[in-house]
Amino acid sequence: MAATRYNSGDLRRQVGSPRAKNRDTKETLCRNVVIYGHCRWEDSGCTFNHDQNKASVSQTDLNSNRRVFNVESPSFTPANQQQSAGKKSTFSSQAASAAPFTPRGVGTSTPTLQQANDSTIFNPAAIREFTPQNYDVGNTISQNGAQHVTQDGGLYSDPFSISSLGQTMPPQGQYNPYANDPNNLAGAGAGLYQPAGFGNGLVHPPNYHLYQPPSELYRPSLQPYQRTTYDFFIPKDRRENLQKKLFHMQQLLPNSGLPNLDRWHSLFPLDTKATRNSTCFGYPSWMYKAQNNKNGRHFALRRIEGYRLTNEKAILNVTKEWKKIINANIVTVHEAFTTEFFGDSSLIFVYDFHPLSETLYDHHFPPNNSHNRLRNTNKIPENLLWSYVCQIANALLAIHNAKLAARCLELSKIIWENNRIRLAACSILDVLHHDSPNRKTIEELQQEDFVKFGRIILALATNTPTLNFNNIDAALATIVPRYSTQLRGVLEWLIKPSAPGETKTVETLLGGITTHLANFANFVMQESDEKEFHLMRELENGRIARLMFKLSVVNERGDSCGVHNWSETGERLLLKLFRDYVFHQVDADGKARLDTNHYLNCLSKLDASSEEQILLTSRDNATVFVVSYRSIRQMLDRAYGELGKESKPSATGATI
């Protein structure tokens, strides 16, 4: 390799400051200070500036003086011409951060010549710092330079807040959360958040995982007498399902454009498809969730679009008969009325609202998103089909005994929730066809109910929608290898016409499926026992909550009952020490001990007035008491009773 042309001593020698080139040398920061942190010739004649703070200020002043005459600007404009045009050369702090003005249209108040002159002036103060696009919406500046205060009350706000994100989201179509499969909501929390199109911003549902227990695969080995924290509360699946129901019941759709009816407000669309479908009723129909103004309850509204009522007695007579039917497998009908709030003549039916329900069609024939076809699901268990048979038969028994007919028996008009089905479109066809000249008799309509009943079960058994049936006999033959002959016999009896002189009845059907009725009743009673067991455990949790109310009322109370510092005197002091014993324990390192089992154990013993004795110690370790749970419970009741004597009764009259 070629030898270097410099000596090693020259490389180690510090390079001197460059020679001054202009009159601003004293304001220029020395290069040695920038590179090495100091200058060797600072006291030996170096004419450059060696004070970094002074250099930054001087450089700022220098730049401000050079704003008007900037060699990098596109063109040169004298300063006097600016002032003659009425343009100020100074900028306020608020105007410096103002966004560049962009005219909305051609017709602006500024002349074209003035715009051309202003565009050639380079204004460094008007250049804003970089902020993420579409997120700088927390603060807005008006045209006069005044800055508006956000809703939070502060001058500055978080640009990534939920309210800011909602303002920047592009408008999208109305989002319907019921279009998703409810089963997917429980998986890994993926379906627990609404998409961006829902409302004006991101909507976060409750945190269902607050009491989520660990996986059963890693459940610790416990003795028979030991319990985990989650054993004291309602099971996670049942609790999560109930919380989802409450959440969907209170769900709103802001700016939906739906009107408020006379006694109904907060309408929320429930249809999973936005297409008009008039197959069942002959008119397009829509489903909404609404809240009643009088009682605050939520109901389901079925709207028949474009129907003009000609006989008011049709609504009164039909709804009067259907309101009498109260059945576990029928959605109760409350009333019907007409309205023009939707811009047309619509007929509204009011039903009970069952959150998290979906139609039987959507549950068993979900669409395949990739091919937009009905996905061929797996075989439906036979015991589930028999469960559907028993439930629909129960509904038809109540309807036929009331001298009525279900009429609208279709997969899309039966709602499903955890293998519980309900007929959800009763009474509608009775009103629509009330004055029809070709109206059939009740006996004929009841016989049609059996045929529609059989076609529903056959569609589920063959994984084929009812509308795709071309040959009933061929469809019945396909279920023989997969299901029992008894199920096929029931379907043939339902679908095929009866022999001359015979009439199908629900009693005859129930007589042929008694074994399955007994199995279904056994399953329902076992589920009822399980719910009662969990309800009893929640009852104990309610007793603990009442104890917590009493302890919170007594502890840390000031002057009361004519006694100064009442909660710190007498036996009330023991209640405070007991509170510390239960909730304020620490470990050997002085850190807080968080043990839910300890909380529940102590409060349960206090509720039971156990004779077990515990050691209560003051915070300064100067006072020690040995007392039983029974004594503490008596002290708590006496202290709460003293407060009750001097207090006024509550407006609701509720007591603990």
UniProtKB/Swiss-Prot annotation:
One Pfam family from the record: Pan3_PK
Classification via Gene3D superfamilies: 1.10.287.3700, 1.20.5.5160, 6.10.250.3160, Transferase(Phosphotransferase) domain 1
Region (Knob domain): 554-656
GO MF: ATP binding; poly(A) binding; zinc ion binding
Motif PABPC-interacting motif-2 (PAM-2): chain residues: 63-83
Domain of life where this protein originates: Eukaryota
Alphabetical keyword list: ATP-binding, Coiled coil, Cytoplasm, Metal-binding, mRNA processing, Nucleotide-binding, Zinc, Zinc-finger
Coiled coil found in the keyword field: yes
Quaternary structure note: Homodimer. Forms a heterotrimer with a catalytic subunit par-1/pan2 to form the poly(A)-nuclease (PAN) deadenylation complex. Interacts (via PAM-2 motif) with poly(A)-binding protein pabp-1 (via PABC domain), conferring substrate specificity of the enzyme complex.
PANTHER family to which the protein is assigned, alphabetical: DEADENYLATION COMPLEX SUBUNIT PAN3 (PTHR12272), PAN2-PAN3 DEADENYLATION COMPLEX SUBUNIT PAN3 (PTHR12272:SF11)
Domain remarks: The N-terminal zinc finger binds to poly(A) RNA. Contains a pseudokinase domain. The protein kinase domain is predicted to be catalytically inactive because some of the residues important for catalytic activity are substituted and it lacks the equivalent of the binding site for a peptide substrate. However, it has retained an ATP-binding site and ATP-binding is required for mRNA degradation, stimulating the activity of the PAN2 nuclease in vitro.
The protein's name: PAN2-PAN3 deadenylation complex subunit pan3
Originating species: Neurospora crassa (strain ATCC 24698 / 74-OR23-1A / CBS 708.71 / DSM 1257 / FGSC 987)
